[in-house]
Curated annotation (Swiss-Prot):
Crosslink feature (Glycyl lysine isopeptide (Lys-Gly) (interchain with G-Cter in SUMO2)) location: K280, K340, K401, K549, K588, K680, K705, K830, K879
Top-level taxonomic group: Eukaryota
Region entry Disordered, spans: 48-69, 157-305, 318-471, 562-584, 859-898
CC per GO annotation: nucleoplasm; nucleus; plasma membrane
Biased composition (Low complexity): 318-327, 355-383, 402-435, 572-584
Protein name, entry field: Cip1-interacting zinc finger protein
Keywords from the named record: Disease variant, Dystonia, Isopeptide bond, Metal-binding, Nucleus, Phosphoprotein, Ubl conjugation, Zinc, Zinc-finger
Keyword field contains Zinc-finger: yes
Organism: Homo sapiens (Human)
Keyword Ubl conjugation included in the entry's annotation: yes
One Gene Ontology molecular-function label: zinc ion binding
Length: 898
């Protein structure tokens, strides 16, 4: 699975690389413009032998057409002055160190491939004169739009931008095979430093012998490792750099990612003539050196090219001395010191605790730089990074001093102010050797005994995890700076000793670079002190979760970059234990991400993002949001009417005797409702003979006893006797004794309603008569599905058909079937034929029955006594005709049934 993932990642990287290649054409125009500016600046500076720089972006070898950066070693000052170094560093840090996580590709270690992006976009440009005034390149110019062009294997995160401080870098990037802790620091911690070195500090190739200035031997360095490859040959010192690929042991390569292998394998294939150093903008250059920690025994000791970039007239003189890669590193004293210096020069980004040591060593460095010019300033930065190793390096620097008398005058030539600035910068980046600007171009003979070299890495492991090379290129206003860059490769023993340290430093994956501060400082030209302060303020961790601090010191013509790896903190995924580095560095420098919702702290941005996506965090966040919304709702104004209605008690309920229900609100409004009117009308007795409503049953009874009613009743009887004999069935005799006690009260309540109700009743009577006539006419033919004459069924605990003279129980359900029968239909037709002379009499008789029923119901309700059994002897006939069939109210129907 892991190999498949690596292959997928490699494929993705290749796809991204192809996209970037397409975008290169667009960027070439911008770079050409920058080149013009640089050429103008170079022309302004004293004419030096131009160093043709063909820079190939860190693209795969499919693009050989891209010129490689060939730094012809000449006495002229190196093209890479402080300003160019600044741009290179800026670009490196803009792109993030994780971009430089180059696969430890199998480099021949003779091809010095370095990402040219670090050269400040000096691609395919022949740099005429190294003496460059500080180019007024705004940070946007420095930042290449498509970073992955130069770093095809850079992760997407690195391309998107450096992660926030404290984000762990890919540990694999720091595990550089076949390198000293210094070189690993060079390569891993900085392909950026290598790029710096290549651009400004052409990484010195270890010279088997210390050739004098401009000597051909120096010009024939065998690029020991891709680091050396990263080092463009400096003038004079490196007339030609032989690129004899020394295959690094495959075990280390096998351990490394296939993507890195591909990158490394591709780049060594591209080899320029030995006289030309390939500076390929491939982050692999750093990775190319086999990891000493992983397989120190298997790894041949790569030769170290000692490059002494000297800005005497702003000329970088690089002594490229070739040591056979297979040759166990016999680091001469110079070689040992120089690798240290290289490491320091490249990026001796030592943790802050090392910075303290640097501060302690700073006075030493100043003294050495001035009184002991013999000691190369590189020794001091190493001493800072290496602690006890400082003394050894300084002592070694003394033989160097002898071998390099030129260095001393150079250091003297540098004004103390510059030294102080350099020291400050060294505190930041600990690139003390570079800090001392050496006026005289001198080739530092590499005479340091190998023993010192081997000792250095182990000590560095303790003091400075992987002695992260710190590169501070301080080009003072006019004093040339001599940058001693020595690719110090330790023998396997030394590698083993320093292996722990190397392991401690994982490769920076997207190392955080405070580019904003760098850009601001470069644009505004902050003081050195401010830059240092700012650099110190920036907490970060080199390697896993470390951030590469880059500060640009801009004074007059030159800028100084200081890259200080802050407290290296191992990532949990990092197999290499970087505990000593973490313990040595102050914990306060590690940036902590804190979640105030969950009260949890995270050591890296990735961990913090993972925490943010956890369901527990989301749940708590939702709870907080809910609470906040509830608080907001509680603060919203509430309408007064709502508050008043809440405070008020519900209105009392009142009983309506007419409707037999409770009602809310005003009595008058209730009486005006349609339901109340219907109930009241149904309860009022109605005389169907006289067509009169009575407010109370008492008045109705009195009316029935009156003579006028009796006369009209006799007339109606005479008419009905002709049709059917027994009209008495329609009359109900009720004992009315005591039924009229509560009538007076009801009369008073109903007086105000009587006028309106009488009018409404008259209209209804007329309407009902019309409807009855229509029904009378409509039932001419029989249909078995139609119920005819339903009105003639009168409920008397059952149903009696007055036409057929049949009775049906209420629960029998036969009333409807009877109405559908043919006999009932024939009888109905006979009845209608008999009623035709006076069709109005039928509704009258029907209403009488219904109204009588209603009157009795009202009497029983008002009196509160159960209805007495109908007494046939008391026949107080109140003949009531049936009303039109309307579904009776449930209340009345239930009472009648019961």
């Amino acid at each position: 699975m892991f190999s498949q993932q690596q292959q997928q990642q490699l494929q993705q990287q290749q796809q991204q690389l192809q996209q970037l290649q397409q975008q290169q054409l667009q960027q070439q125009q911008l770079q050409q413009q920058q080149l013009l500016q640089l050429q103008q600046l170079l022309q302004q500076s004293p004419p030096q032998a131009p160093l043709p720089m063909a820079v190939s972006r860190g693209l795969p070898p499919q693009q050989p057409q891209q010129p490689l950066l060939n730094l012809q070693g000449t006495n002229s000052a190196s093209l890479l002055n402080g300003s160019m170094l600044q741009r290179a560093l800026l670009l490196q840090q803009l792109q993030g160190l994780d971009q430089f996580a180059m696969p430890p590709a199998t480099y021949d270690t003779a091809g010095l491939t370095m990402p040219t992006a670090t050269l400040g976009n000096l691609r395919g440009y022949g740099m005429a004169s190294p003496g460059l005034a500080a180019p007024s390149l705004t940070p946007p110019q420095l930042a290449t739009p498509n970073l992955q062009q130069f770093f095809p294997q850079a992760t997407r995160q690195s391309l998107l931008g450096p992660p926030p401080v404290g984000v762990p870098m890919n540990p694999s990037q720091f595990n550089l095979s076949g390198r000293n802790p210094q070189k690993q620091a060079r390569t891993s911690s900085s392909t950026t430093p290598n790029r710096k070195d290549s651009s400004s500090q052409t990484m010195p190739v270890e010279d088997k012998s210390d050739p004098p200035e401009g000597s051909e031997e120096a010009a024939e360095p065998r690029m020991d490792t891709p680091e050396d490859q990263d080092l463009p040959p400096c003038p004079e010192d490196i007339a030609k750099e032989k690129r004899t690929p020394a295959p690094e042991p495959e075990p280390c390569e096998a351990s490394e990612l296939p993507a890195k292998r591909l990158r490394s394998s591709e780049e060594p294939t591209e080899k320029e003539p030995p006289g030309q150093l390939q500076v390929k903008a491939q982050p692999q250059a750093r990775m190319t050196v086999p990891k000493q920690t992983q397989t120190p025994d298997l790894l041949p000791e790569a030769l170290e090219a000692q490059v002494l970039p000297r800005f005497q007239p702003r000329v970088l003189q690089v002594q490229a001395q070739v040591q056979s890669q297979t040759q166990p590193r016999i680091p001469s004293t110079d070689t040992q010191v120089q690798p240290k210096l290289q490491k320091q020069a490249q990026t001796q980004t030592s943790p802050e605790h090392l910075v303290l040591q640097q501060k302690q060593v700073q006075p030493q460095l100043q003294q050495e730089a001035e009184p002991q010019k013999q000691v190369q300033p590189q020794v001091q930065p190493q001493a800072h990074s290496q602690g006890p190793r400082q003394v050894q390096l300084q002592q070694e620097a003394e033989p160097l001093k002898q071998v390099q008398p030129q260095v001393q005058p150079q250091a003297h030539s540098q004004p103390p102010r510059q030294v102080q600035l350099q020291l400050q910068k060294q505190v930041q980046t600990q690139t003390y050797p570079q800090v001392h600007t050496q006026a005289q171009p001198s080739v530092q003979p590499q005479e340091h005994p190998p023993a010192q070299v081997s000792v250095q890495p182990p000590e560095q492991t303790h003091e400075q995890p992987h002695t992260q090379p710190q590169v501070s290129l301080l080009a003072p206003e006019q004093t040339p700076v001599v940058v001693h860059v020595c690719g110090l490769e330790m023998p396997p023993d030394a590698v083993e000793a320093g292996g722990g340290m190397e392991k401690t430093l994982p490769e920076p994956v997207g190392t955080q670079v405070s580019m904003e501060e760098i850009q601001n400082e470069s644009a505004c030209g902050l003081d050195v002190g401010e830059c240092e302060n700012r650099a110190r303020e920036m907490p970060g961790v080199w390697g896993a979760g470390g951030s590469l601090k880059v500060t640009i010191l801009q004074s007059s013509d030159s800028r100084a970059f200081s890259t200080v790896p802050l407290t290296p903190v191992p990532r949990p995924s990092d197999s290499v234990s970087s505990t000593p580095a973490a313990t040595s560095t102050p914990s306060k420098q590690a940036l902590q991400f804190f979640c105030y919702i969950c009260k949890a702290s995270c050591s890296s941005q990735q961990e913090f993002q993972d925490h943010m996506s956890e369901p527990q965090h989301q749940q708590r966040l939702g709870e907080i949001q809910h609470m906040s919304q509830a608080c907001l709702l509680s603060l919203l104004p509430v309408p007064r009417d709502v508050l008043e209605t809440e405070d008020e008690e519900p209105p009392p309920r009142r009983w309506c005797n007419t409707c037999q229900l409770y009602y809310m609100g005003d009595l008058i409004q209730h009486r005006r409702t349609q339901d109340h009117k219907i109930a009241k009308q149904s309860l009022r007795p109605f005389c169907t003979v006289c067509n009169r409503y009575f407010k109370t049953p008492r008045k109705f009874v009195e009316h029935v006893k009156s003579q006028g009613h009796k006369d009209k009743a006799k007339e109606l009887k005479s008419l009905e006797k002709e049709i059917a004999g027994q009209d008495e069935d329609h009359f109900i005799t009720v004992d009315a004794v005591g039924c009229f006690e509560g009538d007076e009260e009801e009369e008073e309540d109903d007086e105000d309603e009587e006028e309106i109700e009488v009018e409404e009743e008259l209209c209804k009577q007329v309407r009902s008569r019309d409807i009855s006539r229509e029904e009378w006419k409509g039932s001419e033919t029989y249909s078995p599905n139609t119920a005819y004459g339903v009105d003639f069924l009168v409920p008397v605990m059952g149903y009696i058909c007055r036409i057929c003279h049949k009775f049906y129980h209420s629960n029998s359900g036969a009333q409807l079937s009877h109405c559908k029968s043919l006999g009932h239909f024939e009888n109905l037709q006979k009845y209608k034929a008999a009623k035709n002379p006076s069709p109005t009499t039928r509704p009258v008789s029907r209403r009488c029955a219904i109204n009588a029923r209603n009157a009795l119901t009202a009497l029983f309700t008002s009196s509160g006594r159960p209805p007495s059994q109908p007494n046939t002897q008391d026949k107080t006939p109140s003949k009531v005709t049936a009303r039109p069939s309307q579904p009776p109210l449930p209340r009345r129907s239930t009472r009648l049934k019961t």
